[in-house]
Curated annotation (Swiss-Prot):
Family to which this protein belongs: Belongs to the ABC-4 integral membrane protein family. HrtB subfamily.
Pfam families: FtsX
Lineage: Bacteria, Bacillati, Bacillota, Bacilli, Bacillales
Function, as annotated: Part of the ABC transporter complex hrt involved in hemin import. Responsible for the translocation of the substrate across the membrane.
TM region positions: 15-35, 233-253, 276-296, 315-335
Compartments reported by the entry: Cell membrane
InterPro entries in the record: ABC-4/HrtB_transporter, ABC3_permease_C
Listed name of the protein: Putative hemin transport system permease protein HrtB
Name of the coding gene: hrtB
UniProt keyword annotations, A-Z: Cell membrane, Membrane, Transmembrane, Transmembrane helix, Transport
Topology of the protein relative to the lipid bilayer: Multi-pass membrane protein
Main location: membrane
GO cellular component: plasma membrane
Domain of life: Bacteria
Length: 350
């Protein structure tokens, strides 16, 4: 540890340069990760909010909430098995400041209501709660809004916290208003579903159970967006490993004579390797930590309309991966350090 720290202080400019490179790479990875998470949440954040992991929907090859049509008789049969009220979902077009905004309207179901950022849930047919992203369109608490094809003027009484489905903002409104639409989807959400109840539901003609993963995997935009973004993140990790490998390998070559002298005076290869690992770990940790602080600060000032999300889970994962990638990327330096002969390094072989 002492040797590693002394070398960092002696070659501080060199190590600051590497730390800066790590900082830039971490910024890129974190920002793209934040965008990937943000885009993902615009497709599936409703599932975090409605507090359920089992769904009862219309039987279909690729279950999708907005396509789940359940007749009254099927709903009656389902209600005999699970003690849950159904969700109703329909597309609506809001008129906001002269512009049209397509949204997904859902009703309020006890124990499965999305979290509120401010205000309260609708209490009558003239009230609505909107997703927070709609505030970027100029819609706020107590504002009035019209819906295309509906004569009712709605009052915004609540702001929902990050609730979206398939890139559509979720708006909570009275069930009777949703059922006025031509295509109304019906589905059930539950937390607990026994094997027996699941079998009973699946035996109802035209009805099936589905997990959150079943539903999200069939959202076309979710699948289309995540794969290329994930590949970009993986590519950045590979580039990071290559860059760090080049930097540390060149540094090791430049220090060949110093390493040879240290070996000649009795410093073991194990001690030198430990010193190198500590150097890599320290500058990688500091570089990534600074990048994470910067990204967290940036995330606080980004507009709500921008799909960006970063949390402690992402922060920890990026830090751990960078530490691992940093060590893997410097494996060539380990090999070079082990092979350095003290006599040749200090010119004794000539």
């Amino acid at each position: 540890m002492n040797l590693a720290w002394k070398e960092i202080k002696f070659y501080k400019f060199r190590f600051i340069l590497i730390m800066f490179i790590i900082f830039l790479m971490a910024i890129m990875v974190l920002f793209i990760s934040g965008l990937a998470q943000g885009l993902a949440r615009e497709n599936i954040s409703i599932f975090d909010q409605i507090k359920g992991n089992q769904f009862v929907v219309q039987k279909m090859k690729e279950p999708q909430l907005e396509k789940s049509i359940l007749s009254r008789s099927k709903q009656d049969n389902i209600s005999k098995i699970i003690d849950e009220k159904p969700f109703k979902m329909a597309g609506k077009t809001f008129k906001i400041n002269g512009n049209e905004e397509n949204v997904m309207a859902i009703n309020s179901v006890k124990n499965h209501q999305p979290n509120l950022k401010s205000g309260h849930y609708p209490k009558n047919g003239n009230q609505i709660a909107i997703n927070e992203k709609l505030t970027a369109e100029g819609l706020y608490l107590d504002d009035k809004v019209k819906v295309k094809g509906d004569d009712t003027t709605y009052k915004v009484v609540g702001i929902l916290k990050n609730t979206m489905y398939s890139h559509s903002n979720i708006v909570m409104m009275d069930q009777s208003k949703i059922e006025q639409s031509s295509n109304v989807a019906t589905f059930y959400v539950t937390n607990q579903l026994s094997k027996s109840d699941k079998n009973k539901i699946n035996h109802i003609k035209g009805v099936q159970t589905a997990t959150t993963d079943n539903i999200t995997s069939n959202i076309a935009s979710y699948k289309a967006e995540q794969t290329p973004l994930d590949m970009m993140i993986i590519s950045l990790y590979i580039i990071t490993a290559i860059v760090l490998s080049a930097f540390f390998y060149v540094m090791t070559i430049q220090k060949t004579s110093e390493i040879g002298i240290l070996k000649a005076i009795g410093i073991t290869t194990k001690h030198l390797l430990t010193s190198l690992i500590l150097q890599i770990s320290m500058i990688t940790f500091i570089g990534v930590a600074i990048a994470e602080v910067v990204i967290l600060l940036i995330s606080q000032i980004l507009p709500v309309s921008m799909p960006f999300h970063i949390d402690m889970h992402n922060i920890i994962i990026v830090l751990v991966i960078f530490m691992i990638v940093g060590l893997i990327g410097t494996s060539l330096s380990f090999i070079k350090l082990i092979k350095i002969d003290p006599i040749e390094a200090i010119g004794g072989g000539q």
